[in-house]
Amino acid sequence: MRKNKVLIGLFFCIALTVIFLKKIVNVIINIKWFREVGYLSVYLKRFTSVISLFILVFLICFVAIKTYCRSIKKNLSKNESFIDVDIESKSKGKKIINALTLIISLFIALNFSLGYWDKILEFMNSSKFNVKDPIFNMDISFFIFKLPLIESIYNSLLSLLILLAVITVIVYMFLNIKDRVTLGHKIDRNFININNFKSGITKFAGKQLAILGALLLLCISVGYLIKAWNLSYSPRGVAFGASYTDTKITLKFYIAISIVSIISSIIVAFSILKSKVKPIISCVILIAVLVISERVVSGAWQMLVVKSNERRLETPFIEYNMKYTKKAFGIANVKEQLYPLTNVLNKKSLENNKETINNIKINSVGQALEFYNQVESKKNYYIFNDIDIDRYKINGKYNQVFIAPREIDYEKLQEKANTWQNKHLTYTHGYGVVMSKVNSVTAEGKPDFVIKDMPLVNTSGVEIKDPRIYYGEKTNEYAIVNTKLNEMDYLKDSGENATKNYDGDSGIKMSFINRILFAINKGDMKFLLSSDITSDSRILMNRNIVNRVKKIAPFLKYDNNPYIVINNGKLYWVIDAYTVSNAYPFSEPIGDINYMRNSVKVIIDAVNGTTNFYIIDKNDPIISTYSKIFPGLFKNESEIKEGFREHFKYPQDYFAIQCKAMERYHVKNSGTFFSGQNVWDVAKTQKDIDGKKSVNEASYLIMKLPGEKNEEMILLQYFNQYQRENMIALFGARMDNSNYGNLVLYKFPTTKSETVNSPILFKQKIKQDTTISKELSLWDAKGSQVQFGDTMIIPIDNSLLYVEPLYLRADSERSIPEMKRVIVAYGDKLILAENIEKALSQLFDYDKKNDAKEEVILNKKESVPDELKDAKELYEKAIEAQKQGNWAEYGENIKRLGDILNKLNHPK
């Protein structure tokens, strides 16, 4: 018998090991990976916190439930004359109760530890906001870090108490009915006698129910105290947060209900012990009356008193809402100034703002990305996932540029090439970046590259020593490096592959034990069977940079647009990280949050995957709390290496939230807010001539702000009056040097009757211009599709300069959009020209007084035969076809080039 028990126990141990083997292996691999990236303490903190909390909660639940059951068992023993339970039933019941106690305790402990470990750590390590809420005079940290945990524990405890009370009554009724049936009592209307029931339940579990009843009422008391604190998030009034009715009526009722519940808990406990029902009913009725009265009285008060005097009574609460919303979204210190439009822009003004003019963006992100992917991807498995906008010194000159990393898209590998070896051992990394100026295009209207091709052709003056990208936005597969196979680096002009094996220092070594672990973890025996993997091989895991940072610090929110940076000859990724909350008192929610800070910049090495978290907003209490919980995770801003700061950008995701808040919260007067007279909308735009309207995306521009001496990069958004298309303000975020994060708002005077054109009105003006409209119609008639680029509205010397690039796309499947014209507008003038220089020249009469020499030069340029232009274009197309291995197209272009040259040599 003992031998059988041992075998059964051994069988269960083996079965459990097999069932949980993968989870155990996952934990081991996580430990190895976190150690390798330098954040083992972060993982162990989370892991040990969950385990410790699980054990603690399990023991508390198990002991509490076990003690509760034992106390009922004692009552059963004392009252066997009333409830007869045979020995066999006792034995079975004991096993069932033990099993249920174990299961319930495990379930509660598991859910609580996984759901609340972080809240408990936040509670214990909370940092003060040093801002108090206006109703309870408590620091905001209580609402952010402590109230959520209190509320969660309250809900869990209330559910547990109700469950125990219900189970107690059900068990008693079951045993009572079972005994009465066993004794042969008839089942009729007198089967359950209320007096016998009261007496029996008191003997069976009187003390237990008394304690449960008292605890339930104490829970209700705490619940109404929590409801009182939650009035800080009340939606009842004109503005979010506690209203006049909430503070004068509802709050008082909640406090009264809380006090009555405490007193009732004592009365109910004694009443249960004395088998008296009336006091219990009286307490329940009193609490119910108070609950119903609160709803009736507060509703009547709101309708009869507040509605007729709403502006006066709600003014303090509107002011609270305005103050706390601005604080919560970081818009409390916006530098605001009036921007009167004098429209006195001239040639001298443009010369004084030369860098602004030179950096006007005539390339657009969407069209440029399409061109990058068709021309610069080189092979079908390369992809440019996104274009980033940044500023670099191009050959010593401050320039805004487009920059995009060339990554491998494993989904685009040909079916036959999509093997395990290719995906994980050969195609291990992307290659380099392409960079083009935003302010210029080629003669054909294509991006003006300063970095391109493979190997890199770099005329930018920005050095890149190591162009490989092992960690990126599209690197969703693990890579095994330093194997017997060579890693594909880039495609040579000859069509052969250049190879370059990994020379970084990251990755987990593929020892025999580790190969076994990864075979189990990935469910793939190739880790063990592959002869290409050696003991010197390394596995690079979690290479998707967004997934990587989420694995290390999942409690932060991350920007949707990581961007690549060249620094000291290497490639790095920068990701903006946010702290958010939905528990900031009186702050109007935007989506599901009502507090947000861009507190952290994450910098990731594209080759080694080294990931560093830098705190850039040390005044954020949430990030301060996390840094206490996870010492060693975050680094100080002073530790950021030289060369990164000049590429930090104010993030668009954060700015978009702030713009949404500014639509209503730019006002300073509560009366204006109440009347809703000065509400704004983020401006809308159109991408196609007859396309649908869409919300304008804030643009990164290099410009000189009013009153400033130098140009800088600004994130700029345009605001319209609510549900109208005339522009009312410009809102910008600065990001260069010490000005990072400073917000500026330029308001146009509203007293004048003149309309300030928004992006939509500007586009309508373009379509209404007869000259431009004819030109656009002519292009459409020739089978070309006309597309708008990104609209730019640039403030210069109390004037607005409007710029709109126009793209032409041939009506064919694989056509590439080319920037063919630029529309520039100032005041009532609207100019369509081949480039920005010509447009400005016509707009401000640059060249009316120029001498004849310049005119002759221009005429000579214009007299270049069309055949030479065609020859140049055919030559470039032939070279491009050669690089892509398209020899048929190459031959056709060379033949046509020869025909043109013959024609030039033998003119008629």
Swiss-Prot record:
Record's protein name: UPF0182 protein NT01CX_0852
Alphabetical list of PANTHER family matching this protein: UPF0182 PROTEIN SLL1060
GO cellular component: extracellular region; plasma membrane
Signal peptide positions on this chain: none
Ranges annotated as spanning the membrane: 8-28, 47-67, 96-116, 157-177, 209-229, 253-273, 280-300
Domain of life: Bacteria
Chain segments annotated as coiled-coil in the UniProt record: none
Lineage: Bacteria, Bacillati, Bacillota, Clostridia, Eubacteriales
Similarity annotation: Belongs to the UPF0182 family.
Annotated membrane topology: Multi-pass membrane protein
Record keywords, A-Z: Cell membrane, Membrane, Transmembrane, Transmembrane helix
Stored NCBIfam families: PRK00068.1
Protein location: Cell membrane
